[in-house]
UniProtKB/Swiss-Prot annotation:
Keyword Transferase: yes
Listed name of the protein: Phosphate acetyltransferase
Signal sequence interval, chain numbering: none
GO terms of molecular function: phosphate acetyltransferase activity
SUPFAM superfamilies tied to this protein: Isocitrate/Isopropylmalate dehydrogenase-like
Underlying gene: pta
Pathway, per record: Metabolic intermediate biosynthesis; acetyl-CoA biosynthesis; acetyl-CoA from acetate: step 2/2
Subcellular location: Cytoplasm
Keywords: Acyltransferase, Cytoplasm, Transferase
Domain of life: Bacteria
Gene Ontology terms: cellular component: cytoplasm
BP terms from Gene Ontology: acetyl-CoA biosynthetic process
Reaction catalysis annotation: acetyl-CoA + phosphate = acetyl phosphate + CoA
Protein species of origin: Rhizobium meliloti
NCBIfam families: PRK08190.1, PRK11890.1
Length: 316
């Protein structure tokens, strides 16, 4: 989503710097056939965040590069006839172990995710696939996660458990410590009239019983008392999360999408995007994303891949 370069180093800049200290993540880029997607992959590679393998019609990639003066250098290109074939081949390369990350190019999100979700040939795991917005909100101290605002439309309790765990795992993997997680609803009291409040309470109990690990959960919380200390104090809510939430878990996709876009367009927040729960992290970018937001998406995914790589080495 849109943003502007700030005058001072931002939360994104710190994430990008941390990722540059790691080895580049081999990234399968599906159909980068416009200036934005191809240029973003090349710039991320030049910054040392990723090593891209470009999967698309080779002639189209070379035409885009020539038209926009993008230096392909010696980048590996896997030639396929069209965008659908690019999505299928990109997923196949991940299954073959060729890449640590999957990155969306200029094809439609649904086209890529259809291949990712395929039962026999996709990238599903036992965990539910979910999306996280990694937000840099001007004037807000912490990086802010919003989930799920792009994949799961009306998630049930079991899906929400995975959505929460995916977000916690990402927060920890990119080196931000133990997150404070707010399960959002319209109110902060449990009421049968608002089902999301009951699910919020259940998720908190699941965390108490070890069914969700790695974060501190509180809910239900309304948005104001999740992120504003004074609002939490007025409501008499005393917890480590209230007023200090770092991960916001929304009731459904509509609420999450509106929240993320409100922050983007009213506060000029940046919103990097990542899909988790598949075999590898998936970088989902929008045509409206700024260069820095695209780099931040790659950086977060690369940090996640680096932590997984380190864990695999330690396990040997």
């Amino acid at each position: 989503m849109r943003x502007r370069w700030p005058a001072q180093p931002s939360k994104y800049d710190r994430l990008i710097a941390a990722a540059r200290a790691e080895a580049p993540a081999v990234t399968i880029v599906a159909h980068p056939c416009d200036e934005t997607s191809l240029g973003g992959a090349i710039e991320a590679a030049e910054m040392g965040l990723i090593t891209p393998i470009l999967v698309a019609p080779e002639a189209k990639i070379r035409n885009v590069a020539a038209e926009h003066r993008l230096d392909l250098g010696r980048r590996e290109i896997v030639d396929v006839p069209h965008s659908h074939a690019a999505a299928a081949k990109a997923v196949a390369l991940i299954r073959e172990g060729r890449g640590e990350l999957l990155m969306k190019g200029s094809l439609h999100t649904d086209e890529l995710m259809h291949e990712v979700a395929a039962s026999a040939t996709g990238l599903r795991t036992q965990r539910r696939i979910s999306h996280v917005f990694v937000m840099d909100v001007p004037g807000h101290t912490d990086t802010l996660f919003i989930t799920d605002a792009a994949i799961n439309i009306f998630p049930d309790l079991e899906a929400k458990r995975d959505i929460v765990q995916n977000a916690i795992d990402l927060w920890v993997a990119i080196g931000l410590g133990e997150p404070r997680v707010a399960i959002l609803s319209a109110v902060e009291t449990v009421t049968a009239k608002i089902p999301s409040t009951i699910e919020a309470a259940a998720l908190c109990k699941m965390a108490e019983r070890g069914q969700i690990t790695g974060g501190v959960l509180e809910g239900p919380l309304a948005f104001d008392n999740a992120i504003d200390q004074e609002a939490a104090r007025i409501k008499g809510i005393n917890s480590p999360v209230a007023g200090h939430a770092q991960i916001l878990v929304v009731p459904d996709l509509e609420a999450g999408n509106m929240l993320a876009k409100n922050l983007t367009f009213l506060t000029h927040a940046d919103a990097a995007g990542l899909v988790l729960g598949a075999r590898v992290p998936i970088v989902l970018t929008s045509r409206a994303d700024s260069v820095r937001t695209r780099l931040a998406s790659c950086a977060v995914a690369a940090l996640y891949a680096a932590r997984r790589r380190a864990a695999q080495v330690a396990a040997v």
